[in-house]
Amino acid sequence: ALASEPGIKAIIDEGAFHGLDLASELELLPSFRDKALYVAITHPQVFQVAGTINHAHSLSRRYWRHRGNMPPREPDVSQAARDAFRDAISAYFRQNEGRGHRCTVDAYLRVNRYHYFFAYPDNYADTYLGHDEDGQFVRRPQRPAFEVVFLFDPIDGTLDVYAHGGKV
């Protein structure tokens, strides 16, 4: 997914945040695929975060909601604040939809301005039907996660939220 023009832009931006001049490092590589593979090998953390951010930018615009008039201040991204946010998201989905019993929240700062929060609450339980490594048929209960993305811009005071579902 990063072997594209937007993907390489995400890599270069993330590298700059970490004090790396990846534009210069990647300049002589002949293809997007070569550039992405080079970063995956030499700067795996940059590659991982750039992939996450690039993924957010490729999500369907249909499910994004925009809100202005947010307080123009830096959010609290401490572990305690992220834990409280995680618990609030989990509680919301448990109470309103009967899912979200567990949740993980990852936070990323992008180009020293944009705060991304990726929440992964549990979806409804299901059973995996398939074969294990020994070829034996198995039924395994599982709770896959679904994704909710929050993008906060403290300078403009805007919040964009991505949640796949019906129109609100």
Residues covered by each model-derived region:
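Intrinsically disordered, low-complexity polar/charged tails and linkers
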Residues: 1-142
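C-terminal structured domains
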Residues: 128-150, 155-156, 163-168
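Broad gene-expression machinery/nucleic-acid interaction feature
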Residues: 114-116, 147, 158
